[in-house]
Amino acid sequence: MLNVTKGKEIRIEVRFADNFIKRFLGLMFRKPRYVLIFVLPLETRINASVHGLFMREAIDVIFLNSNKEVVDLTVLKPWRFYVPKRPAKYIVEGPRGIIEALSVEVGDRLEWNRMI
């Protein structure tokens, strides 16, 4: 996973939640050891909302628009809900520390490969 704006890269497995079931389950009941990228049908705020139901630990969540520019980010704790401040087309969920490792800030552009 690469922060194009800052030139920072981390090597981590990337998986996609590109259908309803994968988006519904997300990282529930799992320890996050990889990055899960949600591909939403539309760029929206409400449909980009996330929850920490049945999560075992906090995760980093990054919201991106259709240009893969960061529009919001948060640390999602178990059993909490979060609605991004701006519409998102992609949601990146990963283990705590991803945001810091990539020095991610709103406005940065991210890139990824299916598997690294």
From Swiss-Prot:
It comes from the Archaea. HAMAP family: UPF0127 (MF_00263). Belongs to the UPF0127 family. NCBIfam families: PRK03760.1. This is UPF0127 protein PF1050.
